Regions:
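A structured beta-alpha segment of the ubiquitous adenosine-cofactor-binding alpha/beta core
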Residues: 45-77
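General beta-strand structural signal in soluble alpha/beta enzymes
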Residues: 86, 117-120, 138-143, 201-203, ...
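Short, small-residue-biased leader/transition segments that mark boundaries at the very start
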Residues: 2-8
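Short beta-strand-loop/turn "lid" adjacent to the catalytic site in phosphate-handling enzymes
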Residues: 67, 73-119, 140, 146-156
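Conserved active-site and cofactor/substrate-binding residues in soluble primary-metabolism enzymes
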Residues: 54-58, 100, 104, 121-125, ...
């Protein structure tokens, strides 16, 4: 799985059968001097390297190289990777769930660049670099905004002239959706209930923070714009 932003990429290699993380890493300072950190949880091994990364393309290439490195890698070939998941910041109101990446999906991500100018271009570069490195492998886009697309108009519309919504797509979209989805479902599981019989307030606390109100497993409101 890949999580990309303007100057960094986080990666996880997972065993789909167990959910265990086989390797994880971070490429940072993309566009500057570049630095790669690679960790193998099973052994505690940690590798840090300074690697030129002019763009996200070179960062993806560095990730692939360390994964198959004879000394530091955990797989023999990228052919062992079954699929790639990408966390994509902004899906606008086009996506209500994750989707298999095809040309239409990539164009929709491009169309949302005005809404996510720092992250969406980086997400696209990561997707296209993976397509080149692993042609034919399925790739999935997981949108940060998708979980919040169940909000009613009274929650996502602002008290501003309608033209700003219809022409400029100015509305509440919400973020941290993957976190809010997971936490709300896990909360209901721990309470021993069923998804359609609970109201939950979810707090995402990290480098950015947000709250969401979830009813019957669907987002009703969120604090981010």
């Amino acid at each position: 799985g890949l999580v990309g932003s303007e100057m960094c990429i986080r990666d996880r290699l997972m065993d789909p059968a167990t959910g265990n993380v086989t390797a994880k890493g971070l490429c940072e300072r993309i566009g500057l001097d570049g630095r790669l950190t690679h960790k193998v949880p099973a052994t505690g091994k940690k590798v840090e390297k300074d690697i030129p990364m002019p763009t996200h393309k070179e960062a993806i290439e560095a990730v692939m190289a360390i994964l198959v490195d004879p000394a530091d890698g955990v797989i023999k070939s990228v052919d062992e990777i079954d699929a790639v998941g990408h966390r994509v910041l902004h899906g606008g109101d086009k996506f209500v769930e994750s989707c298999i990446i095809d040309e239409a999906c990539k164009q929709a991500i491009r169309d949302c660049i005005p809404l996510g100018p720092l992250h969406n271009p980086a997400n696209l570069m990561g997707i296209e670099a993976c397509e080149k490195a692993m042609p034919g492998k399925p790739q999935v886009a997981v949108f940060d905004t998708a979980f919040h697309m169940t909000m009613p108009p009274k929650a996502y519309r602002y008290a501003i002239p309608t033209k700003y919504y219809t022409e400029d797509h100015l509305r509440r979209y919400g973020f941290h959706g993957t976190s809010h989805r997971f936490v709300s479902k896990r909360c209901i599981e721990l309470m021993g209930g069923v998804e359609n019989a609970h109201r939950v307030i979810v707090c995402h606390l990290g480098n950015g923070s947000s709250l969401s109100a979830v009813k019957d497993g669907k987002c009703q409101d969120t604090s981010m714009g």
